[in-house]
């Protein structure tokens, strides 16, 4: 409800974005949370051997680059666009708070990545954990997806009010944005399942959690357990 109320105030004040567009923009933070949180768990679930150590370090650098690119190519331009909004002070405050959260999250991602990889490098050499798939997913989301969607939503100059087959072009654009967000979320889930299907290690989520000192996440536990039941998992 809060997202909808913010979207309504913002849209009413600027007269350039619809509530649906604003709500979609606010929701762009959600895939970032899902991708990074899930990715960091997957990092510690994909067990590999020492010959992947160099790959681990390379993909770690990729993660740092992705965060840097996100800040420079997405957050800063989006923040600059706030100055073009002609609206109420309340709407501008809501918008500014939104981008402050994006900035703080991008900083937090790098911090968490540092911690995850520092822990990974302390494992027994037969349990070095590369994060190629998880980090590629993060990079794809941040650079290719979020950046594009923010650009579309923040720069709606190409959206016209011309009626086309009973719908305005603006309405069609809104629907397309929402559908792309839904497809992206589906792709994330499929990617997670592929990672789990390739996992061979401890035979239960509890063992995994204890071995790696992970917090118990019940929703994630159910997903992992469901996948483990479908495949033959060898004890580590």
From Swiss-Prot:
GO cellular component, as recorded: chloroplast
Q: What is its main location?
A: plastid
> What keywords appear on the UniProt entry?
Chloroplast, Plastid
Q: Which compartment or compartments is the protein found in?
A: Plastid, Chloroplast
| Source species, domain of life | Eukaryota
**Name used for this protein in its record:** Uncharacterized 27.2 kDa protein in rrn23-psbC intergenic region
Organism source for this protein? Answer: Chlorella vulgaris
């Amino acid at each position: 409800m809060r997202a909808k109320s913010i979207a309504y105030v913002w849209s009413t004040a600027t007269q350039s974005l619809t509530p649906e567009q604003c709500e979609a923009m606010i929701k762009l933070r959600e895939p970032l949370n899902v991708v990074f949180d899930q990715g960091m768990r997957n990092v510690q679930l994909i067990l590999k051997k020492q010959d992947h150590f160099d790959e681990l370090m390379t993909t770690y650098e990729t993660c740092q680059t992705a965060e840097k690119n996100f800040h420079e190519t997405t957050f800063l331009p989006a923040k600059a666009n706030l100055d073009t909004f002609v609206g109420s002070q309340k709407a501008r405050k809501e918008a500014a708070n939104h981008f402050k959260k994006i900035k703080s999250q991008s900083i937090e991602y790098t911090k968490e990545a540092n911690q995850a990889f520092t822990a990974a490098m302390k494992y027994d050499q037969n349990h070095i954990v590369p994060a190629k798939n998880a980090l590629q997913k993060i990079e794809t989301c941040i650079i290719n997806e979020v950046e594009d969607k923010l650009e579309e939503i923040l720069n709606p100059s190409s959206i016209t009010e011309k009626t086309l087959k009973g719908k305005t072009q603006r309405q069609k654009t809104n629907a397309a944005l929402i559908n792309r967000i839904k497809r992206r979320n589906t792709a994330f889930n499929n990617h997670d399942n592929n990672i789990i299907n390739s996992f061979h290690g401890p035979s239960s989520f509890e063992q995994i959690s204890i071995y790696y000192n992970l917090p118990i996440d019940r929703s994630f536990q159910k997903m992992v357990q469901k996948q483990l039941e479908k495949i033959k998992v060898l004890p580590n």
